[in-house]
Amino acid sequence: MKKARFTETQILRVLKEVEGGRHVKDVCRENGGSEASYYNWKSKYGGMESSDIKRMKEREEENRRLKQMYASLSLDHEILKDVVAKKL
């Protein structure tokens, strides 16, 4: 998976600069991002603090790992069911 280009702190700084009255286009150009990224960040992170964003990203990563674990265990379970069924 591709690593995020912007940290939580950078995203929050961009959001706060625009909230402070600067133009989206100017802030995005200065920070190397796109206007589309800004609007995605605004809808996802608007009103959050840096610690909230970090906690949310940690939970998203944990959720991804748990889903992978669940898929692996489900596959193991199906294989074991087939083995038991063949032995009976």
Curated annotation (Swiss-Prot):
Coiled coil: none annotated. Pfam families: HTH_Tnp_1. Keywords: Plasmid. Disulfide bonds: none annotated. Belongs to the transposase 8 family. This is Low calcium response locus protein S. One of its GO terms (molecular function) is DNA binding. InterPro entries: Homeodomain-like_sf, Transposase_8, Transposase_8_domain. The keyword Nucleotide-binding does not apply. The keyword Lipoprotein does not apply. GO terms for biological process: DNA transposition.
